[in-house]
Regions:
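Catalytic-core regions of glycoside hydrolase
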Residues: 70, 146-148, 201, 214-228, ...
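Bacterial N-terminal signal peptides that target proteins for export
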Residues: 2-16
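Acidic, contiguous N-terminal accessory segments
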Residues: 14, 18-23, 27-115, 152-155
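Composition- and surface-driven signal marking solvent-exposed, interaction-prone regions
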Residues: 12-19, 27, 53-54, 138, ...
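Structural motif
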Residues: 41-46, 83-89, 125-127, 173, ...
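Feature activates predominantly on carbohydrate-active enzymes
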Residues: 32, 47-48, 53-56, 60, ...
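Short acidic, S/G/P-rich loop/turn micro-motifs used as interaction or catalytic elements
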Residues: 44-49, 88-91, 176-178, 212, ...
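Terminal accessory regions of large proteins
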Residues: 464-479, 485-615
């Protein structure tokens, strides 16, 4: 009887599994084939954003599937991707779906599927041009491109609006960047495009940094004009970060600085916001900073009437902070758009509490650094801190998702600090979290893998990326996951040879090899030190000089014998590949990085992990 019950339960379980498998198969079969799609576009979408969206769809689909969707002005064909505004009553004689009715919140969009026996229509409907861009981004992120196929699951149809109006990243074309300064105009546009596909709506640059870089392909003036134009074409906000490094109490210096801004505003083709940090750098009292901001706001309005001026309270004393808020309370200036909170600022919660509601509040979050920074990596082994340093490849989806959700409620969004491509996944995490707090780190990472590598979730590449984050959790000696993650990345390295030319893939593999190399070295070198200490303990028997001689010979074996030369070679290979693919400068000597803290992981790859330098 007992065996019968058990057998019966197994039969029931088996039937359930088969049923679920059938459902799964049918769901997969429900994917819509858009391989023959053409684009039908509403003329009411504002130019030049309309033309940019068309180009984005055509080029990104072509890259992934070898399919170039043509533009059409008719509804003929088996599949149509229709782009329209929610204010349109119809598109080429066909009424928009009822689901296309959107709220008036800027950037809102719908992706709607209409199926008939002879035709499928994918509607990309935005409340504005930027909404249509983000609808296109949703389609690209959630579609599956396999061979010559372009597939979309109807369950990914959506009606969506952003939670935070500011979602951006600083991409300063300057010498201290670990990669941006080596980029071409085409690379900058492609990167901005990819950030927009993930929901970014603003980009910030640094126009007044005159330090030359040996990597720059064009002048900083030309590149900043180009980035400004790219933002205009994509319908994104363009910010500039403009610290004041002169004494504003000196009237002549004050006027010269105002003129510098005025001249720049005239030359800049498109500008949305000007951010002047109160400090870091700069040490002017707000009694001088505020009149300066008012003066440049007047100049800004002449050239860019819709643009706004922002200030941060970075480095301000309590007296200076009180001075600033007293000014806002008594004067309530309309020329000030908002306040930025960054490293060295008062807490975000305090700023939002004291800041009058008419002013916006932006988070200047540091998502690029691991140590000596606003949000240092938690429980990071000292061996990683000594070798990887402050600016390594640092995909940390869980950590940065938590940080975003912790601080976002006190702000109107973020424009994050970044000094290179190494924090690429963190940018995508914040861009998606800024759109919706309901999105989680795993889901965003899976979108990242699908869009950039064309790999579906079945190969668990997202898990391998999350494994790199877990590599940094706690003492190396106790972290058995480092070797497991490395083994998985070696399998992926062999399974996807075509991805070897992709800089994002190269960065992840570099980290997998580097983390494992550091762990093996630490275990080896710490064992040598224990052996050296054992030899020193024999001094009473063999004499102190002999004991010291043997101990030094033992502990310095690490300088003569490399425990993992194959891993070391792979690290060099990936550093070389990344220099050529994305301009990543991992060495001061070899790749002319601006300084050892700027991502120079190759220069510190063999940094001692025992005390041999001090014995």
């Amino acid at each position: 009887m007992y065996r019968y019950k058990i057998r019966n339960k197994w039969n029931i379980a088996l039937r359930i599994c088969l049923f679920l498998l059938c459902i799964s198969s049918s769901l997969h079969a429900r994917e819509i084939d858009l391989s023959t799609s053409r684009l039908l576009v509403s003329n009411s979408i504002q130019s030049p954003v309309k033309e940019t969206i068309i180009r984005v769809l055509q080029e990104e689909i072509d890259k992934r599937a070898g399919i170039y969707p043509d533009i059409t002005d008719t509804w003929e064909g088996t599949s149509i991707i229709a782009l329209a505004l929610s204010s349109d009553d119809s598109l080429n004689g066909r009424a928009l779906p009822e689901k296309a009715k959107l709220s008036l919140k800027a950037e809102s969009f719908s992706v709607i599927v209409e199926e008939a026996p002879s035709q499928t229509i994918i509607w990309l409907v935005g409340v504005d041009a930027r909404g249509v861009l983000f609808a296109a981004g949703h389609l690209l992120r959630t579609s599956l491109f396999a061979g010559k196929q372009f597939l979309f699951d109807p369950s990914n149809a959506i009606k969506s609006e952003p939670e935070y109006p500011i979602r951006g990243h600083q991409l300063g074309y300057r010498d201290t960047a670990n990669s941006y300064d080596a980029w071409s105009k085409e690379q900058y546009e492609q990167y901005i495009r990819e950030l927009a596909i993930f929901g970014t709506n603003c980009i910030e640059t640094i126009p007044f940094d005159n330090t030359p870089s040996p990597h720059m392909k064009v002048s900083k003036e030309e590149m900043n004009r180009h980035i400004s134009t790219v933002c205009k074409n994509y319908g994104l906000d363009y910010w500039v970060w403009t610290p004041v490094n002169v004494d504003l109490s000196d009237e002549s210096l004050f006027q010269a600085e105002v003129k510098k801004h005025s001249d720049y505003y005239r030359r800049c083709p498109y500008l949305s916001h000007v951010f002047v940090p109160g400090g870091d750098p700069g040490d002017n009292h707000p009694r001088y900073v505020i009149p300066f901001l008012k003066a440049i706001a007047g100049e800004l309005k002449k050239q860019h009437p819709q643009a706004g001026v922002w200030i941060s309270l970075q480095g301000f004393s309590d007296e200076q902070i009180d001075y600033f808020y007293h000014y806002l309370e008594t004067e309530s200036p309309d020329w000030l758009r908002g306040v930025v909170s960054g490293p060295g600022s008062p807490p975000l919660s305090d700023t939002r509490y004291r800041l009058p509601q008419k002013y916006m509040h932006r988070h200047y979050a540091d998502i690029t650094h691991t140590v000596r920074c606003l949000y240092p990596t938690l429980r990071w082994d000292q061996a990683f801190a000594l070798t990887l340093g402050r600016e390594p490849v640092n995909p940390q989806p869980f950590y940065y998702a938590v940080l975003h959700d912790r601080y976002a409620p006190f702000t109107d969004g973020f424009l994050a600090y970044s000094d290179g491509a190494h924090d690429d996944l963190n940018k995508c995490i914040w861009s998606r979290k800024g759109w919706s707090k309901k999105e989680d780190a795993i889901g965003i990472t899976e979108q990242y893998v699908r869009f950039f590598f064309g790999i579906n979730s079945g190969d668990r590449v997202a898990d391998a990326i999350l494994g790199l984050e877990r590599n940094w959790d706690g003492p190396i000696e106790a972290n058995g996951g480092i070797e497991m993650t490395f083994s998985r990345w070696q399998q992926l390295e062999q399974a996807y040879p075509r991805s070897q030319e992709d800089w994002r893939w190269q960065m992840l593999l570099l980290r997998a090899y580097y983390d494992t190399y550091v762990k093996r070295r630490k275990l080896y070198e710490q064992a040598l030190e224990r052996g050296a200490n054992d030899l020193l303990a024999q001094a009473p028997e063999i004499g102190s000089e002999e004991a010291m001689k043997l101990a030094l010979k033992k502990i310095t074996e690490a300088d003569r014998i490399n425990i993992a030369p194959q891993l070391r070679t792979k690290i060099e290979d990936y550093c070389e590949a990344l220099y050529h693919s994305v301009g990543l400068q991992t060495s001061v000597g070899k790749y002319r990085a601006s300084g050892p803290e700027r991502g120079c992981v190759l220069d510190f790859v063999d940094y001692p992990l025992n005390n041999r330098w001090w014995l």
